[in-house]
């Protein structure tokens, strides 16, 4: 049986909020089977819990934010959720003492490290996968995203930026998902932004914590970060990382092919909502044997399972 996973013990990290610029403390804790991922704002009195569900995503400008019916929000969840998805964590309680998850280095890598430090614990209930039975597609102008049947989880993603540095890099990636491929090839890709946008963002109280410590920054012609890029195709890989996180609010690992052109947080969430609304387009499945599971969540680097 392929079992659900949580973390072995609580872990904490401190960073800054990308948009607020304020210090944020994040704690990740074990949770019982079938809990899913629940985020908790501990700076509220009493603390406010928001389950990570597609319908709770009510803001997708510059990041993905969960917002409850009272308007209480937790923003910038996508990089943390990419790490949870990448390591196959089904159940966790995540406490944060601010309205946003810390940005760390702008990638999912610090969250992968944090989860590996906590240890990964297999639980007593079967892991449920969301299997795509027929294609579901959403469009917005020339942008589109689609999920269709596939035996594992494949990503086929293309971006199209006119910027010379991005245009010179590979802007199209096809990959079959596994935990090891995610950790090695995707998790270190950082968010990126343009100098020309920063003034506007800051005037709107956004990106106040943004810097070359947590983003790839470009002027009109080139990357300004002294150390350059982590991957030659870091731009498209970061968009894939974002999509992994955005799709994980479906509540389960997806079995299917995700194909996207120029998509972002808004369209990713629209796709998840469209999928879940069409109940004949998917089913939840479990696997008796490791060999039968079409997606490998084997953690690289010899992480010990409890």
From Swiss-Prot:
It holds the Pfam family LpxC. The active site is at residue 265. Zn(2+) binds at residues 79, 238, 242. It comes from the Bacteria. Its cofactor is Zn(2+). One of its GO terms (biological process) is lipid A biosynthetic process. Keywords: Hydrolase, Lipid A biosynthesis, Lipid biosynthesis, Lipid metabolism, Metal-binding, Zinc. It catalyses: a UDP-3-O-[(3R)-3-hydroxyacyl]-N-acetyl-alpha-D-glucosamine + H2O = a UDP-3-O-[(3R)-3-hydroxyacyl]-alpha-D-glucosamine + acetate. It is an enzyme of class 3 (hydrolase). Pathway: Glycolipid biosynthesis; lipid IV(A) biosynthesis; lipid IV(A) from (3R)-3-hydroxytetradecanoyl-[acyl-carrier-protein] and UDP-N-acetyl-alpha-D-glucosamine: step 2/6. GO terms for molecular function: metal ion binding; UDP-3-O-acyl-N-acetylglucosamine deacetylase activity. The keyword Hydrolase applies. PANTHER family: UDP-3-O-ACYL-N-ACETYLGLUCOSAMINE DEACETYLASE 1, MITOCHONDRIAL-RELATED (PTHR33694:SF1). Belongs to the LpxC family. NCBIfam families: lpxC. Catalyzes the hydrolysis of UDP-3-O-myristoyl-N-acetylglucosamine to form UDP-3-O-myristoylglucosamine and acetate, the committed step in lipid A biosynthesis. This is UDP-3-O-acyl-N-acetylglucosamine deacetylase. The gene is lpxC.
